Amino acid sequence: MHRLKSKFSHLALLLCIAPPAIGAAPRSITELAPLATISLGKTADWVAITADAVWVASTGPFAVHRIDPKTNTRIASVDLPGEACAGLAIGSDSLWVPLCTTPTSLAKVNLTTNRLEAIFAVGPAAAEGGIAFGAGGVWLIINESADLARINPANGAILRTIRLPPGSYNPTFSGNTVWVTHAKGADVTAVDAATGRIIAMTATGLNPRFLTAGAGAIWTLNQGDGTLTRVDARTKRARTISLGTPGHGGDIAFSEGRVWTTMPEVPLSLIDSRTDRLLCQWAGPGGDSLGIGHEAIWLTDYHAGTVERIAVADALAHCSRRGHFH
């Protein structure tokens, strides 16, 4: 890490910290009545959404499940040789599933046939990592040295590796750039997908892990201090706001000008990307991973092994009423 800091001493780590911007006291998650609750296994985690499906992983069984958003029913389950432990990604007509097998591995699920197509001998560096797809490749941190690998989706071959700060685990792809949070630090690294060159390191809140892209920015959910950092994708300038949600786990997604986050005990938070303002929070049981699509929030309850479908319109309507937790 010291070597990387020296190499990029000419790059400013720009961070503007804003005070909490909470529009209302936390509400109860029970006010959001699910349109459907789908039981998947002992635990449910990780959500990926396509134009015609919602995919969610489980343990007990080790599997990924395809849900039809038209009927809110599970229409396929694909058994896996181990736990899906580091996110899900969509690309090249496939669902990509990092597995905490021994040794770790990468599953490729065919989105057309709903079948396990391949298991590649490359896998995630750690649980709670992530995976991304972009520029025709799969992107994954593959070891504790934090080598970011670009993987050939056809055969699982590693095409290139880029050394990042140790403790970096979670990538996302946006605008021909791979962004990777430094979960054991307080920064995010931008990598040019075409050249493999590190082009920026930007300060964030403490222990950023899960991240998403939208509104010309990268958004990091920071586990160490319960904050959210917005990094301008062009200027690399950052602004951090308080969410009051520190802790392990969690997830983040962007849709239609809004950022949604989830953490255990605070299953849902809503942030306006235009103002960087925390509009509403819902507290209570459940939460841990989410996806936004098909006019719905797909929210897992990890320990219950379920995923709920909550209408975005319902959440927005309740938020506009500015009620309080009860």
PLM regions: where:
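Bacterial N-terminal signal peptides that target proteins for export
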Residues: H2-A12
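Predominantly soluble domains enriched in secretory-pathway, periplasmic, or organellar proteins
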Residues: C16-H326
